[in-house]
Amino acid sequence: MIKHIGLILDGNRRWSKKHALKPWEGHEAGRLTLSILTRYWASKTDIKYLSLYALSLKNFLERSSLEKKLLYGSLERGFIDLLNDKLLKKEKIRIKIIGKWNLLPDKRLKKVLNEIISKTKKHNKKVLSFFICYDGQDEITEAAKEMKNVQRITRSTIKNNLFTKDLPPVDLLIRTGGEHRLSGFMLWDVSYAELYFTDILFPDFTPSSFNNAITEYKNRKRRFGK
């Protein structure tokens, strides 16, 4: 049984290039795809946790100011739509924002993020996590800093100091866009996850594509390193 799926949303910019569009038009197409996908997950599956790699810390630091500004606008529109979606309340979905998103310069976006966190904090049926300004090595580094005065450190101690302390291990990690790497996503929590890579660029990733990944997972035998 799948409890937790992680999804690396990759391929927006290549999709825009393929269709002779501007990079931010690819991000907007990805936003619309994500809306369809999350609604499908929320209403049509029994998977409790879905974690989305929306913006890496590396991309936040290195992308051009213009692209980031337009990306923030796309994120804001997406979260406003999510905030007003009745499905959040109906399915009791809690929204978590994970990473150093306090670094975001866009005050309106941060306001929306704080609002959606507050509005859904008591929901307990499903958990939808957005990783923004996140990097797995940075997460572990920050955990180490928190443990500087701890005398006996165990795996549980480390987990309890991670940004993802309230999330279970990832069962299935999906990456769209054709790349075969983790790019720093949830490094501690994907240690025994099944990995599924697809060449489909994220704006073209459909609920059917999502189900194909789940079917592939169910056909595998998990060994957990044994």
Region locations from a protein language model:
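Flexible, compositionally biased loop and terminal segments
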Residues: M1-K226
